[in-house]
Amino acid sequence: DNDLLDSNLSAADHSTDTPTNNFCTWNSSWQYLYEPIISEGGTKAGYHNSTDENAKATIGLTNGKWYWEAKPVGTIGSQFIGIQTDGDSNLNSAQGILLNYTMVIEPQGRYYSYAGSLSESSAGQFTALTTSDWLGIALDMDSSTQTIKYYKNGSLILTRDLISEMQGRTVFPFLQNYESRSFYINFGGYTLNTISSAASDANGYGTFEYA
């Protein structure tokens, strides 16, 4: 590895992230019509200047089993998190969930998917999250039927098969903010979230509250 030497940083301000121990972050190079301010080493997508602001991650997933965590920030409602394909353009809609192929949840208990038109579930798909809850997202790209699972504080709350348009495609972690309503993300490296249990994923990588 070729690693840089850090200075004037506390242990809480950095984590190991090398070519052989690399973690996902939010990617400021993905362009949307409205974009958040990405900071804190790519783990915070903060309010910029528009109602609906979107971010996609640095690592696209085509196979394997993947896990990441998030905590809701701000008023609960109208912030979305999940996965999205890459697509050719992210600039033709004010709402990023209405682009490419998308699967997300909203923390009040609804599930959404987009494949040319938006499909919205009824309310009560799961108990609403609070700002103290940990949301775990587990993506299985290896099984014959690819799935995404959502966990609340370590307990499974929702399982969805990937929509047919997503099967076999490259997908990315994705979020859409609503004003200052967002999620603080933990892809396994540095995170703004305070972790008490320091669990690793099934392959022994990352630091998570649950895994």
Predicted regions and their residues:
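PRY/SPRY (B30.2) beta-sandwich protein-interaction domains
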Residues: D1-A211
